[in-house]
Amino acid sequence: MLVIAGLGNPGKNYENTRHNVGFMVIDQLAKEWNIELNQNKFNGLYGTGFVSGKKVLLVKPLTYMNLSGECLRPLMDYYDVDNEDLTVIYDDLDLPTGKIRLRTKGSAGGHNGIKSLIQHLGTSEFDRIRIGIGRPVNGMKVVDYVLGSFTKEEAPEIEEAVDKSVKACEASLSKPFLEVMNEFNAKV
């Protein structure tokens, strides 16, 4: 089974914020793959289905971003999923808005959701799709920026990044993630 987790914060107030771009990808995958996110266990909202002959579990942790590992570790234990079968999608301040970057491992890079995952999984070796949200300007605090909505200028770039992330997830069903990473990172 492949687990694809999108990081974000639960609740209407956070729905279209920069920090919730991981949730946006999961919602798009659920729609395209006809997987209903109808199970609410392990502090997460998730659903399972078969895509291209592979069993897939899509999940949105409902623990708030900084505690994402509290959802994923017990969920992965319950379904007996290894770390190499996990792909995590999340926002990244260090990438320009709308750019995506795939990685197979790495540090948290200051991202508290990833920090929580590394802590709970006991490793930094899991596949990631990072979606660029850019950095705040004019002295805006990072917390206000990541919890803010995309501007109308950013919206088309984010839609394109969500679409690319969906395509990367689809490609990873039939190819090794490293191959998908090389293909998609070359497009940046």
From Swiss-Prot:
Deletion phenotype: Cells no longer grow vegetatively, but are able to sporulate. In depletion studies cells are more sensitive tetracycline; a depletion mutant with an rqcH deletion is hypersensitive to tetracycline, suggesting this enzyme functions in the RQC pathway.
Marked site positions, Discriminates between blocked and unblocked aminoacyl-tRNA: N9
Residue numbers marked as site, Stabilizes the basic form of H active site to accept a proton: D91
Alphabetic keyword roster: Cytoplasm, Hydrolase, RNA-binding, tRNA-binding
Localization per Swiss-Prot or TrEMBL: Cytoplasm
Molecular function via GO: peptidyl-tRNA hydrolase activity; tRNA binding
Chemical reaction(s) catalysed: an N-acyl-L-alpha-aminoacyl-tRNA + H2O = an N-acyl-L-amino acid + a tRNA + H(+)
GO cellular component: cytoplasm
Membrane-crossing residue ranges in chain numbering: none
Main location: cytoplasm
UniProt-listed Enzyme Commission number(s): 3.1.1.29
Record-stated family: Belongs to the PTH family.
Protein name: Peptidyl-tRNA hydrolase
Encoding gene, per UniProt annotation: pth
